Amino acid sequence: MSQEIVIGGGKRTPFGDFGKSLKDIPLSDLATHSAKATLTDTNIDPVDVDHLVWGNVLPVDPDGFYAGRVAALNVGMREESCALQVNRACGSGTQAIITAAQQIMTGHSKIALAGGGENFSRGGFVNQKMRWGAVRGAQPFEDSVEWAYNDPFGHGLSLIHI
């Protein structure tokens, strides 16, 4: 089944220095901003979008775990529309585009919106032992941002293989 897929336009999420101007902005707000700008520039009515696919490595806010769905509803997509969040390390945004194209190619969507973004400035410190009660000794906190940079496959390898 061959079908032409068209990328109608695109906007990027804002880009800033770690801990500076974007440190207080939730990931879903960044997703909403780029999705809304893309829809405006392409003159697409949000109610016509069937699916939003969002790529993200480090969900740093309560609504960051499903930032794509939050953004979909924020921009005015139908409640019946679908959303999906993908994590493929550094290739998450690229995977979002691929997955959105697959939604169209398989007939699951006529119009799909794809994007990706991070806000590492909002990454927290984690203590995995405290939930179940640490018994003794020092209980250090780990920087979740470091997890993203030091994943077991090395920074950037996922994108190379997509």
Predicted regions and their residues:
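Glycine-rich, flexible loop/turn motifs
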Residues: 11-14, 18-21, 80-82, 121-122, ...
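Short glycine-aspartate micro-motif
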Residues: 7-8, 110-114
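Generic secondary-structure signature for well-ordered alpha-helical cores
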Residues: 1, 13, 39-44, 73-80, ...
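Conserved active-site "lid/cap" helical segment
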Residues: 1-57, 61-71, 75
